[in-house]
Design a protein with these regions (language model features):
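Cleavable N-terminal export/targeting peptides
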Residues: 1-17
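Transmembrane beta-barrel domains of Gram-negative outer membranes and organellar outer membranes
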Residues: 12-257
Length: 258
């Protein structure tokens, strides 16, 4: 029984959690189409609701490598000083690559991940170290994430990129699979804002995730309230960070395999 569950983890879909990635990759020639919707809401003294939406095409290339292409839409609704509601919308494109170094079936699964994204006048680079391990019907995953955010600016008649923000995030997730089609667990995220080498805050999120799946599809839902700012600074002295981050995030993913 333990071996059969390890095989399920190793060979099935590559996504189990709403936020945390696993080391699985699609077999060569297989591809997924995924629809993402993330709502972020709750700012201090302000109405705020952001919707991040993605359409993803993901394909296995063989040799433990897969790639994916995303079309992204970002919309924000927020109240201004006069309590009027304003809205902004941006579009973007992303390309990710994942290389599985080892599988979680008999030892710790290890994968390396890289993503480049374009959004308005911003260019983003993201890397992940992915670790996971299956224990019978349980799956544990850990991600260490580093980002580099570059923003285009024009100064003195010249174009330049401002690369001040380098956030770091640590993600930990655990899921128990009650049967081959349903699992439930928890995810915890520690997001650290770093700018110009200064560690500004450390925002902790914790919430449940469910995964419901069939042979050719899956549905994932994640609810993630902000718990606390565990690294208080002069710039961010509060118990929570609710100006640059939101009180609550919720995500739904629907995927189809071919």
């Amino acid at each position: 029984m333990l071996l059969s569950w390890s095989i399920v983890f190793a060979e099935a879909q590559d996504r189990y959690f709403g936020r945390t990635y696993t080391s699985n990759v699609l077999p060569k020639g297989n591809f997924d189409i995924e629809l993402w919707h993330t709502s972020r809401f709750g700012h201090a003294n302000q109405y705020f609701h952001a919707m991040d939406q993605r359409v993803e095409y993901e394909v296995g290339l063989g040799s433990n490598v897969q790639t994916a292409f995303y079309y992204n839409r970002f919309q924000k609704s927020y109240s201004d000083s006069s309590n009027a509601i304003s809205q902004t919308t941006e579009f973007g494109f992303s390309n990710e690559w994942k290389w599985r170094v080892s599988q979680p079936a008999s030892k710790v699964g290890v994968a390396l991940y890289g993503e480049i994204g374009i959004r308005g006048d911003e260019l983003e680079f993201e890397t992940k170290l992915i670790l996971d391990k299956s224990f019978g019907k349980n799956l544990v995953a850990f991600n260490a994430v580093y980002e580099l955010e570059a923003e285009a600016e024009r100064e003195n008649g010249k174009n330049k990129f401002e690369m001040a923000n380098t956030p770091v995030e640590l993600d930990l997730a655990v899921m128990h699979n009650f049967c081959t089609s349903f699992g439930a667990g928890l995810e915890i995220l520690d997001h650290n804002d770093i700018s110009n080498g200064t560690w500004n805050n450390s925002v902790l999120y914790l919430g449940p995730t469910i995964n419901y799946r069939g042979n050719r599809w899956f549905f994932i839902a994640n609810y993630l309230p902000q718990l606390s700012n565990v690294h208080k600074t002069t710039a961010f002295p509060g118990k929570q960070v609710v100006d640059e981050h939101e009180r609550t995030e919720a995500r739904i993913l629907i995927g189809f395999s071919f």
